[in-house]
């Protein structure tokens, strides 16, 4: 059996990434305060359809993702179809794979095209850290169910008497691993200590990310892939990511205290991604259909891979496991790539993965390879800045990475690019795209 992955349909046609679009990314409780993930998803899909000048009835499937779920609208994909003027018969379902969610939605649409069941679909993801499903304590939740069953006033009074004042306090969603209780920041601290990553190196990577992102925006490179978002009640709009430190100086990073290990830590708010609101989407077609409709795709999917590791120690190593698998399936080595886009959840996590890419010992012990994945050439790495600067709406990051690397490859005359991310649950994702 060949290790090569055939990302084509039965006619041998590649899967075309026709276009990609996202909202600006905004820090929690700023420009998108009060705007749900669903509303941002509808916003970006509507604009994607408008810019593509494609009849919405041509869309055969929409797969969309969300990490911080809205209990009132659990199938965000279907709600987007119903709220954007798309044909009501358009198939739609939702996925979630933590920070790799829109990698998954993209692959799901691609695989539907590969089977020949359809030719055109939309994939993406959205998350809001400003509109959250605020819960209640377990004791109050239990009491509310009992209250619903109680018949007499006396029974209801007895239920209320079981509750203390602290039981009535709202419970925000945990930004932590369910099975371990560890937050992502605590995991990043683990990785900084395991791989001896200094505070100075973390701050330097964050400074690089913000500096490059500022240069990218100022050069107008993101104009085609970031829409202006008008926020209800439509008296204001946002047309640029608002987390980027446009006057970043390396010295300023040293002033912050560690956020997760106050005494011995090195992970700070400045070398981590903030909680972020935003949405993104890509339009996918079979190569033949794209050409028949007159589109020039921004890229084609060459290979992809998903992996999983244990969650107790250094679980944000997903790129180091998924990348070699995606490379193998593409018949490539790391040095063959033109560009590399790695999700920067934390500077510590990013640097740990970069270190393991170059480690022969890691390759032998963890991957069963006789050579390292390869040392990353920084002239190819996150050349437009990364998540540390742009921000990270969990489900939207994957399609941001894919769209961004395709457009940059296009500007450079083509080539191959890697988009890769770690994700909660010890998950990893990688996708290789080719651009003509």
UniProtKB/Swiss-Prot annotation:
InterPro entries the record matches: Ac-CoA_C-AcTrfase_FadI, Thiolase, Thiolase-like, Thiolase_AS, Thiolase_C, Thiolase_CS, Thiolase_N
Reaction equation(s) it catalyzes: an acyl-CoA + acetyl-CoA = a 3-oxoacyl-CoA + CoA
Organism: Shewanella halifaxensis (strain HAW-EB4)
Source organism superkingdom: Bacteria
Active site as annotated: 99 (acyl-thioester intermediate), 392 (proton acceptor), 422 (proton acceptor)
Recorded GO MF terms: acetyl-CoA C-acyltransferase activity
Main location: cytoplasm
Full protein name: 3-ketoacyl-CoA thiolase
Gene Ontology terms: cellular component: cytosol
Family, similarity comment: Belongs to the thiolase-like superfamily. Thiolase family.
Taxonomic classification: Bacteria, Pseudomonadati, Pseudomonadota, Gammaproteobacteria, Alteromonadales
Role summary: Catalyzes the final step of fatty acid oxidation in which acetyl-CoA is released and the CoA ester of a fatty acid two carbons shorter is formed.
Assigned keywords, A-Z: Acyltransferase, Cytoplasm, Fatty acid metabolism, Lipid degradation, Lipid metabolism, Transferase
PANTHER family (alphabetical): ACETYL-COA ACETYLTRANSFERASE, CYTOSOLIC (PTHR18919:SF107), ACETYL-COA C-ACYLTRANSFERASE (PTHR18919)
Top-level EC class as recorded in UniProt: transferase
